[in-house]
Amino acid sequence: MPQESAFVPLLLALQDIPYGDFAYKLIPTLSRERIIGVRLPALRKAAKELTKQQPEEVARFLHTLPHCYHEENLLHGFLIEQVKTFDKAIAYTEAFLPHIDNWAVCDTFSPKLFQKHPKETYTHILQWLKSPQPYTIRYGIGLLLSNYLDDYFDSEMLSLVASIQSDEYYVNMMIAWYFATALAKQYEATLPLIQSQTLSSFVQNKTIQKARESRRISQEVKDFLLQYKLPTI
């Protein structure tokens, strides 16, 4: 097991055991022993304070992977969000992604610098989508969902995500989430893909399910999408 970092005592001081029990139920890929139980607002606050008060220790922490505890990984992501330059933020992210082992860490950190440098970030996303690591792929799709379905949208992104072939549940769920959000934000561009029924039955049907659960999609469209569900084996 990796050595505990210097920040573990701080995390233990913020421990909320019932919250840890709750988090464990949501993250079946982790053992309970790896979850301290710290709420996200407390972790974000700690990341901001540590960046200001202990920059050298933060730098050491960001260069030391892997970590022991789930909350160390969450803190790692939030510390990357505090980095002031794009080059450092992307370098730290590149180093961190292979060590992400669950959806919760994957989905909770997203440096604002990536939004300010969409073209540069996109070149990295293209590589992440080709990764053998499922959570690296999921992270790349997640950035396309959050940062590239409005002003920076390009229809080629739909094709890129559609081309991803994976047996990983957490990859396919993110693909479905992406296309459901794309239906809400870029309906005209996304609908032909759903109509083509070329996605796997799991992704196709989950996309339609999530779209039908969305408050941003009209009831008329929700009913219309039902005809494109695929039979499951």
Model-found features: residue ranges?
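Alpha-helical scaffold domains
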Residues: 1-233
